[in-house]
């Protein structure tokens, strides 16, 4: 049985986590076998949304209801997510990638290193240009940081240059990307990075 690469996607409510899973799957599933796990507090709404996009069939999506503390389900007690991973691997023994989307949470939420191999943390511009300056652990410790909805910057008075400067201050040389996922702006750069650094395509012969 192939051991899939597990990629965690975290971020606040409304930042674009589910859309990021959708877009990444859409562009990667021609080359890789993919499944997804979504975490919601009391519903399986994100799993339903992902299913409606058509990028994955129903048997490749599992919705996890985490209860009151979504960060606990991806870090302190990730048992429900481990069970979902096991179930997906039983259903499909050839998976290359499993995306694990966290429930919407605060800037301090991080994934257990036992649960995921890589993590992506996403915020959106509409939350304010000061968000990177707050230096939450999700932003600092994630392997990749995504600032989404750049198209909204003029409408909310956010300076992307300031956001980039603050991001560099906290992340140093760790990668970050500006995106407008709705129109797929900046998406290809993120995918290229993932192909090279997560899927190690450049090392494959």
Curated annotation (Swiss-Prot):
GO terms for molecular function: GTP binding; GTPase activity; nickel cation binding. InterPro entries: CobW/HypB/UreG_nucleotide-bd (IPR003495), P-loop_NTPase (IPR027417), UreG (IPR004400). Belongs to the SIMIBI class G3E GTPase family. UreG subfamily. The gene is ureG. It holds the Pfam family cobW. One of its GO terms (cellular component) is cytoplasm. GO terms for biological process: urea catabolic process. SUPFAM superfamilies: P-loop containing nucleoside triphosphate hydrolases (SSF52540). It is found in: Cytoplasm. Facilitates the functional incorporation of the urease nickel metallocenter. This process requires GTP hydrolysis, probably effectuated by UreG. GTP binds at residues 11-18. This is Urease accessory protein UreG. Homodimer. UreD, UreF and UreG form a complex that acts as a GTP-hydrolysis-dependent molecular chaperone, activating the urease apoprotein by helping to assemble the nickel containing metallocenter of UreC. The UreE protein probably delivers the nickel. The keyword GTP-binding applies. CDD domains: UreG (cd05540). Keywords: Chaperone, Cytoplasm, GTP-binding, Nickel insertion, Nucleotide-binding. The keyword Amino-acid biosynthesis does not apply.
